């Protein structure tokens, strides 16, 4: 139908979501450039919003499935000019993947700095639209995030994003070591059993523990949530352990 045609491209969805959050056409133009490096004219943005606006609210509040196998929660950070002052802002996206591997954008939200309480509001929005149960929620490493998920969806498995974790781990690694450190860490999360993954982390510790003790500590302290995907069939694993599907 008409709505599907206009919501068919990811860019249209981003424009509509930003506009729906109360940003002006000029703000939307600036945000798209900042977030995606995309330059799009104010006229084109108006064209998209004018055509779809009557149905936008319907899209934002549309009923969702009661159950999803996997939901990804991710935030992008950028600065927005408000009353002449630049403020840090988080842009939240919520995606699902169904059993056929099809991806669906459930919601886009824009709201101040990222914080676990903001994510609580996002999760409550999903519940108010009919979501009752989620098998796995994939998240970044925000403090308090897991507790918020458990509060709203007590039986959901929390999977911390391996991509985010790798980024954090590699932050202070010397240039000359980067390739080898990344390869050795890859052995941890590509293991097919938890036992093999623990062995790979132990081997990493022997090789690099002295120089990069913080990496070993990071993985050990978050082990259960980083390795949650190992409890699922191999076909599902890669789909689970990253918030960047």
Go through each PLM region and give its residues.
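A polyampholytic, Gly/Pro-enriched intrinsically disordered region
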Residues: 67, 176-195
């Amino acid at each position: 139908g008409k709505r599907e045609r206009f919501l068919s491209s990811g860019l249209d969805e981003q424009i509509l979501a930003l506009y729906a959050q109360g940003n002006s056409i000029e703000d939307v133009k600036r945000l798209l450039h900042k977030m995606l490096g995309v330059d799009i004219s104010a006229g084109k943005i108006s064209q998209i919003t004018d055509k779809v606006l009557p149905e936008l609210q319907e899209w934002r509040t549309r009923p969702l499935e009661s159950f999803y196998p996997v939901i990804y929660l991710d935030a992008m950070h950028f600065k927005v000019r408000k009353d002449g002052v630049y403020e840090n802002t988080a842009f939240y996206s919520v995606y699902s993947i169904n059993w056929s591997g099809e991806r669906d954008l459930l919601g886009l939200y824009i709201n101040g700095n990222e914080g676990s309480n903001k994510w609580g509001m996002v999760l409550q929005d999903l519940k108010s639209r009919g979501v009752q149960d989620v098998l796995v929620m994939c998240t970044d490493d925000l403090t308090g995030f897991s507790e918020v998920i458990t509060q709203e969806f007590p039986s959901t498995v929390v999977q911390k994003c391996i991509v985010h974790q790798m980024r954090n781990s590699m932050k202070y690694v010397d240039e000359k070591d980067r390739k080898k450190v990344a390869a050795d860490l890859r052995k941890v999360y590509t293991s097919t059993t938890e036992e093999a993954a623990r062995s790979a982390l132990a081997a990493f510790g022997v090789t690099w523990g002295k120089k990069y003790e913080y990496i070993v500590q990071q993985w050990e302290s978050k082990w259960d949530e980083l390795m949650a995907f190992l409890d699922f069939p191999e076909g599902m694993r890669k789909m689970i352990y990253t918030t960047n599907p």
